[in-house]
């Protein structure tokens, strides 16, 4: 999958291209990340990409022209990479909140162009003419769009075919089926008075699967009850829930 990231700080994306699952996927060309600096498309000796906002107010606003040229260049790179559909995504506090369903939709694309804002944001006309989607990673303010963009890229890349050494890993992640993940344990068996649940050491796969589901369901019910309402349970899972109800009686 091809990614073009429009950012004033391309060096930050070494965190994606050089480390972890996304780094390995990049080295194996499962994912390609190309960073484009809008300063390269700015005019004048100072290569300015920001100006004061019309109407007054604090801070600076990123100018439309250099960003538009950067996006056009990104689209050319996407076309050269063979992308049929590479939408332009702007990471913005005003966008829809990113979730697992949205990530899976992105995985189905063959390319993505991600715009990272800075300062007080970008000129609205740029958004109107060039941006296809706006996405947020939460209701809080960051210094720029680079960290949200890295969150987006990492969440997509780890879902790409062959990106993970164990294909079952992402299937068992939190939110994939609407539930949070279950508790995880490793060696040693005993740690500061706490023991690993015996069922996990039993080797009985059916019992382990049931235990993990019940843990996931109860954890989601306790911490994110609004998610439970959206979950579609299998016949077996509904049967397992009777054990959870019986344990409370």
Swiss-Prot record:
GO terms for molecular function: tRNA (guanine(37)-N1)-methyltransferase activity. GO terms for biological process: tRNA N1-guanine methylation. GO terms for cellular component: cytosol. InterPro entries: Alpha/beta_knot_MTases, tRNA_m1G_MeTrfase_C_sf, tRNA_m1G_MeTrfase_TrmD, tRNA_m1G_MTases_N, tRNA_MeTrfase_TRMD/TRM10. Coiled coil: none annotated. The keyword Transcription does not apply. Its EC number is 2.1.1.228. Signal peptide: none annotated. Belongs to the RNA methyltransferase TrmD family. Homodimer. HAMAP family: TrmD (MF_00605). Specifically methylates guanosine-37 in various tRNAs. This is tRNA (guanine-N(1)-)-methyltransferase. It comes from Acinetobacter baylyi (strain ATCC 33305 / BD413 / ADP1).
């Amino acid at each position: 999958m091809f990614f073009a990231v429009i950012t004033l700080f391309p060096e930050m994306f070494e965190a994606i291209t050089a480390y972890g699952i996304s780094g390995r996927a990049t080295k194996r060309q499962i994912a390609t990340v190309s960073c484009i600096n809008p300063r390269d498309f700015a005019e004048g000796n100072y290569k300015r990409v920001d100006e004061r906002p019309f109407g007054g107010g604090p801070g600076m606003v990123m100018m439309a022209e250099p960003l538009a040229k950067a996006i056009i260049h990104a689209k050319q790179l996407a076309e050269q990479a063979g992308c049929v559909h590479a939408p332009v995504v702007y990471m913005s506090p005003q966008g829809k909140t990113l979730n697992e369903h949205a990530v899976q939709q992105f995985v189905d694309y063959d390319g993505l162009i991600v715009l990272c804002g800075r300062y007080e944001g970008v000129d609205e006309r740029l958004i109107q003419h060039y941006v296809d989607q706006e996405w947020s990673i939460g209701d809080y303010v960051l210094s720029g769009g680079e960290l949200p963009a890295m969150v987006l890229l990492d969440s997509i890349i780890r879902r790409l075919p062959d990106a993970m050494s164990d294909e079952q890993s992402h299937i068992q992640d939190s939110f994939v089926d609407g539930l949070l993940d279950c508790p995880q344990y490793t060696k040693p068996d005993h740690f500061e008075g706490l023991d690993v649940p015996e069922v996990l050491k039993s080797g009985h796969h059916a019992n382990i699967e049931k235990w993990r589901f019940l843990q996931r369901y109860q954890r989601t019910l306790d911490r994110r009850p609004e998610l439970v309402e959206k979950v579609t349970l299998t016949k077996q899972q509904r049967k397992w829930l009777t054990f959870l109800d019986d344990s409370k009686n």
